[in-house]
From Swiss-Prot:
GO terms for molecular function: structural constituent of ribosome. HAMAP family: Ribosomal_bL36. Keywords: Ribonucleoprotein, Ribosomal protein. This is Large ribosomal subunit protein bL36A. Belongs to the bacterial ribosomal protein bL36 family. GO terms for cellular component: cytoplasm; ribonucleoprotein complex; ribosome. InterPro entries: Ribosomal_bL36, Ribosomal_bL36_sp. The keyword Ribonucleoprotein applies. GO terms for biological process: translation. It comes from Enterobacter sp. (strain 638). The gene is rpmJ1.
């Protein structure tokens, strides 16, 4: 999980979701693409 100021989709499988007020990127194809804004 990367913590970044600006989260971006890194591939076409990445999805941006908002959970409990935190913006996250989840990716089914590449788990290394997981990010959250912080």
């Amino acid at each position: 999980m990367k913590v970044r100021a600006s989260v971006k989709k890194l591939c076409r499988n990445c999805k941006i979701v908002k959970r409990e007020g935190v913006i996250r990127v989840i990716c089914s194809a590449e788990p290394k693409h997981k990010q959250r804004q912080g």
